[in-house]
Structure formats: C-alpha cells, structure tokens
Amino acid sequence: FFGLTISNDNLVIKVLQSVAEFLEEGTEMHHCVYHNGYYKNKECLILSAKDMNGKRIETIEVSLKTFNIIQSRGVCNSQTKYHKEIIDLMNENMYKIKKITSIDKQKAVA
C-alpha cells in the first residue's frame, strides 16, 4: 500500500507507512492508534486524512477482509466537519485498496 494516495480538492488521504508514523499520528491526534498497536494488525489498513495545508483531520481504519471502514476519528476520537466527506471519498476509492490487495494475494500464491 506504500504510495497509495486518495485525494480531492479539500483532502489528501495516505496510508501510515511506518511505526514512527503511527506514533506521530497517535500523538498529534490524541488517540490510541499507536499505543494499541494498530501497526501490528495485518487485517486492517490505517490511513491519515489531512487538509491541503497538511493538518491532520482524521485517522481511518479499513478492514482488509470486508473493505469497509471500521472507524474514522479526529482529535480525541471526535468526528470532524470533514467526516462525511472523508467517508465518501474513501468509499469512492475503495476499489484501489481492493486492487492492491488482489495483486498482493496473487504474488503470494505465485
């Protein structure tokens, strides 16, 4: 999922790519994405939604089994004014995550 970016005119959503990024996300957003070890969970994908100025807005958890959004939370687990826009943008682009997952499964079989 490295390099996966989802965006529109207001938002840029990217996959958290390292343990350090999980720590930074959890610290800045004041939630448990780092301390609960989400980076260890191979059944979910964690992304960070930011505005065009680079300000973190929400952290998104996607199930890699169902391709549903499990949760999307702002600072201190709040919902933000961008919440619906983030959910809609993720759902419109979920096919990108499915496609990458499908390619990874094919490589594992080969």
Range-by-range predicted roles:
Residues 1-110:
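Catalytic-core elements of nucleic-acid end-processing and repair enzymes
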